[in-house]
Amino acid sequence: MDQSLSFQPLLFGGDINVYSVARAFHEAYGVRSVAFGKYPSFPCHSSAIIDYRVCPDNESDEAFLRNARAVAEEFADKTVLLLGCGDSYVQLAARHRDHLPENVIAP
């Protein structure tokens, strides 16, 4: 990963949508995205361009906030760009937008 980047992509989901977004970030910026999905599923699991983390309760409010906060702390020196790659994750991001750490933005 290019350490000079000022942002870190954080993706929620585990399907081809997540892989496509991660691939776009990787091709444009050389960055490896962090992604949380419910299952160790293809094509995200074991991808070289995604730090894929399995979270069985990924769609719960508690897990969403816990995972967002953990990545915000892990990348405290960067702006974490949180993207939901599915309707349920977009809803979680919208619902908890005001409860995310300062270095996390959810457009």
Give residue ranges: language-model regions.
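ATP-binding N-terminal substructure of ATP-dependent carboxylate-amine bond-forming enzymes
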Residues: M1-P107
